[in-house]
């Protein structure tokens, strides 16, 4: 005997997977639940199909920034070297809107306090000196060369970036536990 998922009465199931009795109200609730689940799946697929290139860029940037903030968790601000208390920004050394080629480059983006990133426009003079200490002058030179190249991302490339950083976030969070 099993207990019905909806009316909580005892019933004899026909199969081991059956979770509700054959009362018309319970069957109706079960059918509505199945329809709702199917609609949610269909809606999610439709939403993905309607996403534009700019939607994928925004999503890729959100996932990438989340990864940067997790990677740099506990480190001081890259620009002012003060401990980051509260909200954190993923600060781009080369502006993300003007230098598309290094927009998702991990050497170009580091955690920064809101004061430096938003109110001091990245505090770039201090950022550069600390960036040299962090990644080295050779890597910074390569980054500067890459930054001057032009690039346009395709939706498939952005999907790969999203999946790559979602996986990194998942692995990081799994290792944290």
Where are these regions (language model features)?
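A boundary/linker detector
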Residues: 1-63, 151-177
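Short, cysteine/histidine-rich loop/knuckle motifs that typically chelate Zn2+
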Residues: 6, 23-25, 78-81, 115
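Residue-level signal for mature regions of secreted extracellular proteins and peptides
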Residues: 14, 19, 70-73, 106
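Short cysteine/histidine-rich metal-coordination sites, predominantly Zn2+-binding motifs
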Residues: 20-25, 38-44, 92-100, 128-136
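Short Cys/His-centered divalent metal-binding micro-motifs
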Residues: 25-32, 85, 109-136
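Short Fe-S-cluster ligation motifs
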Residues: 48-55, 106-120, 138-160
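Short cysteine-rich loop/turn motifs with clustered Cys
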Residues: 61-89, 113
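Histidine-centered nuclease catalytic patch
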Residues: 78-109
């Amino acid at each position: 005997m099993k207990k019905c998922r909806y009316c909580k009465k005892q019933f004899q199931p026909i199969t081991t997977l059956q979770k509700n009795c054959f009362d018309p109200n319970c069957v109706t609730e079960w059918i509505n639940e199945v329809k709702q689940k199917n609609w949610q799946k269909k809606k999610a697929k439709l939403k993905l199909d309607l996403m534009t290139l700019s939607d994928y860029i925004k999503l890729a940037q959100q996932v990438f920034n989340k990864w940067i903030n997790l990677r740099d968790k506990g480190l001081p601000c890259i620009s002012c070297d003060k401990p980051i208390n509260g909200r954190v920004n993923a600060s781009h050394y080369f502006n993300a809107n003007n230098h598309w080629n290094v927009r998702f480059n991990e050497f170009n983006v580091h955690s920064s306090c809101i004061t430096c990133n938003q109110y001091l426009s990245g505090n770039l003079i201090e950022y550069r000196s600390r960036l040299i200490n962090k990644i080295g002058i050779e890597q910074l030179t390569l980054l500067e060369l890459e930054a001057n190249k032009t690039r346009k991302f395709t939706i498939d490339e952005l999907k790969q970036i999203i999946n790559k950083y979602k996986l990194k976030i998942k692995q990081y969070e799994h290792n944290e536990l």
